Amino acid sequence: MLFRILIILSIALIQKTGDNPGKRIIFTEDFEQSFLNLNHWNYELGDGCPNLCGWGNKEYQHYTKENVFVRDEKLVIKATKQGDQYFSGRITTKDKIEFQYGTVEVKAKLPKGLGVWPAIWMLGHDIDENYWPNCGEIDIMEYVGRMPGKIHTTLHTKDSYGISKNTKITTVEEIETGFHIYKMHWNESQIKFSIDDQEIYTFAPTEKTAEIWPFDKPFYLILNLAVGGYFGGFEVDDSILPQEFIIDYIKVYKDINL
């Protein structure tokens, strides 16, 4: 009986997932439930005040639970405006799903229009003690409506703070149309990014000090849709609202020999 259980567990750990055979699954989220799984996710609410008003970027939105929901087995983060106030959503896996190394794969459809700023990103699990940017940040995908057709991938570190490096802007025709797959492969030596299985950027510094490479520890996932701000732009076209950032699935996996 024990042998049988071990075989079943081994098969589960080395299960094939779509185009990723022979991978060891760390985390998967396909939003089959009609509600957000709070065993995996946390809501981040409000405007960041008093400690981080505007979420550190002078963003306009207040985050609410109501602006994050599951519809047709997909996660929807919806940006809206009511009166003079913008609302949207942000969720994280902090303290629930954290991992070191592996591949993150997210299939998502972007919102569009001046002022929207969706992102798929990660922060070091020690951010509460080792403040940003020392904790490290991995931006798997950022898009801003003021720069249509372009995807931003960036690594934020103490070494790169205030300097435009460790970043890539990739032009993708019709990126706002339909779903696309954003992927980040991370190991002890490098971080690679791809869109629809086309590699776009690799960060592989030869020197790996804490200032350059704070990526040797667990990180957690963040999904959000901001409105306005330093990067999103301070001009918002209210006529395009509401807008939705839709996530079909999330997979985190490692090679079976890791």
Where does each model-flagged region fall?
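A general, composition-driven signal for non-globular sequence regions
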Residues: 9-10, 182
